[in-house]
């Protein structure tokens, strides 16, 4: 399942080697032919271990990082960080040292950094793995929010119970093969 997310966000074959058969299309364009900056503008990824995607020590800088890379004006950075914190209700995590956060709080900041960039596609790899029950409920609300915004969401996940009312389709994989595609009702 992680391999699929790495294909969609362009990490395979650009950063992870292997034999690639077939094509991965996003908006009708083959991912392997697009430069990473174009993919990153369209596809936002939240990895299972959020520490692997952090580039800053404090939470506000981390949330702003992707926007800064788009060379946005400073005032827009400030506004987007504030709007993200408001939309996701994570004000209590602002201006904190990332190394002092719990695993679940780090996951929330990783999600917020992607949300601030406003991608069309969200890729989440095991987003509930570091979360307690309350945080899983918050994650569900965040997913409901981005779905309402018309975003595409692809989630690689073992825990499905919290996604059943949100999912349009569930793709069941076993040993790297698609064994079935279901609606939540069929699953």
Segments (PLM) and residue ranges:
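Catalytic Walker B motif of ABC-type/P-loop ATPase nucleotide-binding domains
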Residues: 122-125
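ABC ATPase NBD Q-loop/coupling interface
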Residues: 23-38
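Hydrophobic anchor residue at the start of the ABC signature
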Residues: 111-112
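Conserved ABC ATPase signature
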Residues: 97-101, 105
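H-loop/switch region of ABC-family ATPase nucleotide-binding domains
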Residues: 157-158
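Conserved ABC ATPase "signature" region
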Residues: 75-93
């Amino acid at each position: 399942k992680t391999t699929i997310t790495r294909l969609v966000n362009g990490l395979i074959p650009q950063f992870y080697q292997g034999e690639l058969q077939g094509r991965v299309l996003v908006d009708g364009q083959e991912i392997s032919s697009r430069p990473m900056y174009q993919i990153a503008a369209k596809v936002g990824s939240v990895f299972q271990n959020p520490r692997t995607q952090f580039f800053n020590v404090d939470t506000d800088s981390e949330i702003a990082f992707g926007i800064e890379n788009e060379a946005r004006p400073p005032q827009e950075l400030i506004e987007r960080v504030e709007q993200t914190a408001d939309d996701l209700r994570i004000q209590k995590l602002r201006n904190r040292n990332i190394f002092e956060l719990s695993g679940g709080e780090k996951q929330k900041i990783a999600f917020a950094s992607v949300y601030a960039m406003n991608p069309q596609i969200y890729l989440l790899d095991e987003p509930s793995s570091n979360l307690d029950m309350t945080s899983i409920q918050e994650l569900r609300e965040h997913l409901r929010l981005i779905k309402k915004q018309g975003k595409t969401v692809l989630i690689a996940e073992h825990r499905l119970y919290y996604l059943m009312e949100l999912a349009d389709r569930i793709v069941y994989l076993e040993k790297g093969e698609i064994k079935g595609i279901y609606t939540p009702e069929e699953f």
